[in-house]
Amino acid sequence: MKLRFHTATVRYLLLVCLAGPALSAAAADTVTRCDELAAHPLDPARVAPGQSSGAIDLPQAIARCRVDVAAQPDNARVRYQLGRVLFYAGQFDEAMVAMRRAAEGGHAQAQFVYGIFVIKERPGAPRDPCVAARNWQAASEGGRHAAAVHYATQYLRGTFDACDDLAAAEAIDRWLQAATRAAPPGYAGYYRLLFVDDLRYRLR
């Protein structure tokens, strides 16, 4: 099987590519106060120690992230973090917009979360599983291993059967192998390995 890129995927990836270069590498790597307050522990692009949801001072993080997004509107990482804390605070409409824009800006963690929003039919999310498929495909290529696991799961369930831009089984298997290599030690890693191994078996 070959990886198929059809019109919708080409448009999405082109949008991601065009959105990325607007922010210089130096600016993108600068640690903001928003990073310090709201970085996700599992974000592969985080530049500060991650904060669990329960450890975040939401009013402070929202206020600071708004300031940092205004100062760096093309910084998809910071915009993702604004979307994250807005969602935790129950400000779903604004959170959805921020997450979508961060995903369109090429931020893998935002692409993963936005796909979750779509599949779980969160308020304001499009009711189109193919949107989740495109975002998880991009996030998987960006190193967000959870996106690969979710993609493979929904792919095997037939959720994406109506989509015309699916990844080939070989590509999904490559993402899952990367997830396996990143498995943590201990029971958490053990159960991840079992689950991912089962997904890979079912893809054959």
Question: Where in this protein do the model-derived segments appear?
Answer:
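Single-residue signature of alpha-solenoid repeat helices
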Residues: 61, 95, 132, 168-172
